[in-house]
Amino acid sequence: MTMASVPKPDPQEAAKYFQQKLDCTTGPIELSHWIEEKASVQVVDVRAADDFEKGHIPGAVNVPRDQWAGAKGLSRDKTNVIYCYSQTCHLAAAAAVEFSKKGFSCIELEGGFITWQRASLPVTQTAGKA
């Protein structure tokens, strides 16, 4: 029987990594509080338009991948909270990289839309759609 190799990261490197993660991500409960408190955030859904229409975080703007070049709907004055489908979807991270390079302040909603739903937080549909 062989023993599994368990990583043992350098504590200083781990501290840097986790601080950067905290600086660049948020969870659904924290985001819901920011929305309630009218904090300086713009929620950005990077899922496909038809999925956005079926349900999204209230107040979110939809910027699907084919619209990233223009970054229409993002805010230069607020922190843009980017989300996609789930924890395994990397669209939000890819969008955050692209938007950050364009000068937008961005963080990622960890777990995406599915985590928001599982927390029983409000979901809205686009008027006249879905």
Q: For each predicted feature, which ranges?
A:
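Short low-complexity, flexible loop/linker segments enriched in glycine and/or proline
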Residues: A119-Q125
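Short beta-strand/turn micro-motifs composed of small residues
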Residues: D45-R47, C84
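Catalytic cysteine-centered active loop of the rhodanese-like fold, especially the PTP/DSP P-loop
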Residues: L74-Q117
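Helix-loop module immediately N-terminal to the HCX5R catalytic loop
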Residues: V61-N80
